[in-house]
From Swiss-Prot:
Residues annotated to bind Na(+): G78, T81
Species of the source: Deinococcus geothermalis (strain DSM 11300 / CIP 105573 / AG-3a)
Membrane topology listed for this record: Multi-pass membrane protein
Protein name, as recorded: Fluoride-specific ion channel FluC 2
Regulation: Na(+) is not transported, but it plays an essential structural role and its presence is essential for fluoride channel function.
Cellular localisation: Cell membrane
Amino acid sequence: MPFWFGVAVGGALGALARYGVSLLVAGRLASTAWGNFPLATLLVNVLGSFLLAFITTLALRGLVSPAWRLAVGTGFIGALTTFSTFAWESDLMVRDGEAARASLYVLGNLVLGYAAVLLGRALAARLGGGA
């Protein structure tokens, strides 16, 4: 099977997962103070950071094939996560006079995303037989 096919299938599944997360979060938060906070984007970006670190660490140890790494990393995780939406939503909050909320959102994406990378890498290293 060609690599591009795995990337395409992974991408389709990642896009559907992202859409599903946005529906779930919107339905649960609509009537709360967090209703207009872009929590779905934050969640998929943090989850994607964890998953990419996890799968890449396993791949670097030879525990995941290049085909799976591409299908999951480039395809699924690439479609699940979104830097462009994160940037756009940050700008919208600033333009709406919500600079503090935008700052929280930007810091949340960066700090939680990096923490998720550290956790994903550590978990994969542990499961893969190394530190």
